[in-house]
Amino acid sequence: MRVDADDFARPCGDGKMHHEIKEILIEPGAVNALEEAMSEGFLKEYISPLLICDTNTCKATEKLMEDIFDRCQVLVLDADDLQADQHAIEIVENYMDEDIDLILAVGSGTVHDISRYVAFQYKIPF
């Protein structure tokens, strides 16, 4: 299922429209669509993306995502007791390079919550 984030965009409290989320893709084979978007699609403009996933997702998709991992800075969070809390946010913040221009979350809802929060704090597209 492809979700166009513009369908859910609403003006912020400051009256402006903010578009931090480009697209949400939930379907079998989503990894293939991500690779295509990075090489030929709407994500090709980003030169220094940070991909965040957890150990479960990394293990399950490692072979499929080899090309994507080569194009990104990759942070693999330990899935054991992973929570969207200050500790996880600090791990991401300490790992990030200054030139990160996109954050990609691959995997669980917790990974997405952490990624979305950091992207919002640093005003990086997500």
Predicted regions mapped to residue ranges:
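ATP/NTP phosphate-donor binding region
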Residues: 1-102
